[in-house]
Amino acid sequence: MSSIGTGYDLSVTTFSPDGRVFQVEYATKAVDNSGTVVGIKCKDGIVLGVEKLVTSKMMLEGSNRRIHSVHWHSGLAVAGLAADGRQIVSRAKSEAASYEKVYGEPISVKELADRVASYVHLCTLYWWLRPFGCGVILGGYDRDGPQLYMIEPSGVSYKYFGAALGKGRQAAKTEIEKLKLSELTCREGIVEVAKIIYGVHDEAKDKAFELELSWICDESNRQHQKVPADLLEQAKVAAQAALEEMDAD
């Protein structure tokens, strides 16, 4: 890509002759090389899942989290550069707190997604900034019910029934499309997300990984929370069993 973009990839404010912004494309590459992130909208809430690649055997379990709470009713999962993701989380928390202070009510998921997307896009407009090397899947529960958005490094934001980022995004999207999300509960969704992440993990190329899961549903009192340890373990067992069954076939 560098040979094609020579002279046009030095600044995010420079377009190539064919209308491309190479700095944004490079940022997207950072997302594509990350562990897989999946988000689905079930009939009673949202489930977020992350394939958090373990870079060292010395790393403590649970460190370097990829799923973060933004407000009591919303959370986001990060694919790409973790440090860039933390900056977006910080901004999202600030926007949520500011909105509630001014208007006296929790920020809607759509408004939060729009504000975060505008902030991400801002970093593609000025030469002294660089695009964020991460993408996020934002989920929440507001007066309109469960909502799911994906924000890309370019600042583009779309609403989804199911979304995926990272290395296994294409395979994950294919599996998500097979699910009847309108009939799926979050308890069932946890297992399905675990199966997808275990299924797209490439043991030959990738390191070991840690499964992160969170949900926002009636069972969690419509608050963004980590999936309880017992349900997480059940999901892992079901996913591993499905993977072994697939290998046996």
UniProtKB/Swiss-Prot annotation:
Keyword ATP-binding assigned: no
PROSITE patterns found in the cross-reference section: PROTEASOME_ALPHA_1 (PS00388), PROTEASOME_ALPHA_2 (PS51475)
Coiled-coil stretches: none
Major localization class: cytoplasm
Subcellular location: Cytoplasm; Nucleus
SMART domains named in the record: Proteasome_A_N
Gene3D superfamilies the UniProt entry points to: Glutamine Phosphoribosylpyrophosphate, subunit 1, domain 1
An annotated GO BP: proteasome-mediated ubiquitin-dependent protein catabolic process
Entry-linked Pfam families: Proteasome, Proteasome_A_N
Record keywords: Cytoplasm, Nucleus, Proteasome
Stored InterPro entries: Ntn_hydrolases_N, Proteasome_alpha, Proteasome_alpha-type, Proteasome_asu_N, Proteasome_sua/b
Keyword Cytoplasm annotated: yes
A GO cellular component annotation in the UniProt record: nucleus
Membership in a protein family: Belongs to the peptidase T1A family.
PANTHER family xref list: PROTEASOME SUBUNIT ALPHA/BETA
Purpose of the protein: The proteasome is a multicatalytic proteinase complex which is characterized by its ability to cleave peptides with Arg, Phe, Tyr, Leu, and Glu adjacent to the leaving group at neutral or slightly basic pH. The proteasome has an ATP-dependent proteolytic activity.
Subunit structure: The 26S proteasome consists of a 20S proteasome core and two 19S regulatory subunits. The 20S proteasome core is composed of 28 subunits that are arranged in four stacked rings, resulting in a barrel-shaped structure. The two end rings are each formed by seven alpha subunits, and the two central rings are each formed by seven beta subunits. The catalytic chamber with the active sites is on the inside of the barrel.
Protein name: Proteasome subunit alpha type-3
Record organism: Oryza sativa subsp. japonica
